[in-house]
Amino acid sequence: DAELGKKALRNVGEVFKLTDKQITLNPTIENNNEPEVRGIALDKDQIQISVKNVPDKPGTASTICSTLAEKNISLDTIVQSERKHKDKTKDISFTLKKNDRSDAKYALKELIGNWQGSKLEEGESIVRISAVGSGMPFTKGTAGKIFRALANQKINIEMIATSEIRTTCIISEKYGEKAL
């Protein structure tokens, strides 16, 4: 529905302080015949933190991300688990820069003290490998090819994040060079 779309864009514009010129309803994206993947990037400056057993209710993810943003900590890959049926909680995992580790843990420790049963868990040493290409939206199966290439090297994927022109896999640090 066009009216619903316009309302959503107005709300986004207000939240992110966008001008009318910066907002487009149903933008057209044309195949520019760019390569499916133009480059691969390996980021070794990442860690993974999970906040376990957080309340499964509106605002929980916002509270976690806002708490970290107040400490100038940026998150990249964010994954939320399905609800755990017994206690109505979820787990939220994310990656951030290694040098933000102690600030993030300190900020989150105070926050999760308010949520009974919640705890912080630091994942194993990880790296972020990303395939980037403006041809991805026009090529079917790009993510599958990336996942297959990693599987062929016996590399397990811990987390996945995608955008229109990027597919990112979080993998064990020991496989970073091999994944390239």
Label for each model-derived stretch:
Residues 1-180:
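A conserved regulatory-domain signal marking ACT and ACT-like small-molecule sensing domains
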